[in-house]
A protein has these predicted regions:
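Long, low-complexity intrinsically disordered regions enriched in Ser/Thr, Asp/Glu, Pro/Gly
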Residues: 26-28
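Short aromatic loop motif centered on NTY/YTY
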Residues: 194-260
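Structural signature of eukaryotic scaffold interfaces centered on beta-propeller domains
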Residues: 153-161, 217-224
Length: 260
């Protein structure tokens, strides 16, 4: 774009000189532009096309990285998600399809959508992502196959009132920055096929996971069983962390912290 700006200034100077010369010769400025302006305009368009396109693609990639989980957590509390079950009853893949489609700027969600579109064609080696879909146990995950933690994990529980509680846990790891993590919970109403943020369950989990006495946390959503394992990390003053584990037991509607 710097080349285009210098080129525009040069064109402006040339235009001024041409106007002065053509005025003296009795020609209009429009006549002068018809012979010189058109080829130069083509050149300018060509330059802008070849240079601006890569910059645009790079900018898009930077935005996706910079947003991280903020693009999801920034407005999820007020966002309802519509689910389109493929069968008579919604399953974990239906929940994942709906959630990841709503928040498809996050890379693990993109990969999960790609897998769900055609599981047999999904190449985990090429994609550098692995997707586990365990429909019978109501669990699905999309994880980056590197030392960096970057994933989306989901599962659901059947509630006493006939609804489902859908849980989501995400970590967005980075080589250069501290990892982001977030958990979300939704109440799914099968009568309306709508996922509504469940802030009551979130508050229960927050009391344990966001304990200020610890530096960080991670949730282990159950692939088998019904309880959530919470890992709390504290800096041990050396080159690592001490881990404290707590258990949130499913009670049919929400979770109860198991006394130590």
């Amino acid at each position: 774009m710097r080349i285009l700006k210098r080129f525009d200034k040069w064109m402006a100077m040339v235009a001024i000189v041409c106007v002065a010369m053509l005025t003296g010769c009795g020609k209009s400025a429009n006549e002068g532009e018809s012979t010189q302006g058109e080829p130069k305009a083509d050149e300018a368009v060509a330059t802008e096309t070849t240079e601006a396109q890569p910059e645009s693609e790079s900018a898009d990639e930077d935005v996706a990285v910079d947003e991280g989980l903020g693009a999801i957590t920034g407005n999820w509390k007020s966002t309802l998600i519509t689910v389109s079950p493929k069968g008579n009853k919604a399953n974990i893949e239906d929940f994942a399809q709906a959630f990841c489609s709503k928040y498809d700027s996050y890379e693990p969600n993109k990969k999960m959508l790609k897998y769900l579109a055609n599981p047999k064609a999904f190449d985990k080696e090429k994609e550098v992502y692995g997707v586990i879909s365990d429909v019978s146990n109501g669990y699905i995950s999309s994880c980056l196959w590197t030392e960096i933690d970057r994933f989306t994990k989901m599962c659901y529980w059947n509630r006493k009132n006939g609804h489902q509680l859908v849980g989501v846990f995400m970590i967005n790891g980075s080589e250069n920055e501290e990892a982001e993590n977030a958990f979300l919970f939704y109440d799914f109403d099968p009568n309306t096929n709508t996922m509504t943020p469940d802030m009551d369950v979130c508050k229960v989990v927050e009391k344990v996971a966001l304990d200020k006495d610890f530096a960080d946390y991670a949730l282990e959503l159950p692939q088998k069983g019904k309880d959530i394992e919470v890992k709390l990390y504290s800096d041990n003053g050396e080159d690592g962390y001490d881990i404290t584990e707590k258990l949130l037991k499913w009670n049919g509607d929400s979770f109860t912290l198991v006394a130590e």
